[in-house]
Amino acid sequence: TTMDETTRRAIEPYASPAKKRLETLRTLNEAGIETWAFIGPILPLATEHRLEALLSGIADAGTKKVFVDRLRLKEGTWAMLEPSLRGLAEDLPQVYEKALEGPYFRDMARAIIDLAARHGLTAEPAF
C-alpha cells in the first residue's frame, strides 16, 4: 500500500516492510517464478504518498503486473483503521466518506494504471 514506513506501521503493523517485499519479488522473479503485486486498499492520504517509488520498486524487482483495489469497509473495519489514520488529517472521516462514495477510487486507479505503464507495468483493478 505504501513505501512510507511510518504509514505502513500504522496501517499494516504486522506486514513486512515494503523494501523486504520488493526484495522477495526480485528473488522470485530471478528464479523464474512469475509474480504480481497488489496495491490495496488504496487509502486517501496514504497510498498517494510515494506512489512513484512504489511502482518503480515493483518494476525494478522484475514484476510485470499490478492489481489495485479499493477500500472496502466491512462492519468494524473503520473502528480498527481510524485510530491508525487519525494523524494523517484532521478531517479524516470526511476524506474517507468522500473516497468511499465519490470517484476517488476510479481516479486513483486510473492514475496508478497510467503511472504503472510509464514503468513498463500492466495494472488493473483487482475486482
Where are the regions a protein language model picked out?
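Conserved AdoMet/S-adenosylmethionine-binding subsite of the radical SAM
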Residues: 1-104
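C-terminal accessory regions of radical SAM enzymes
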Residues: 88-127
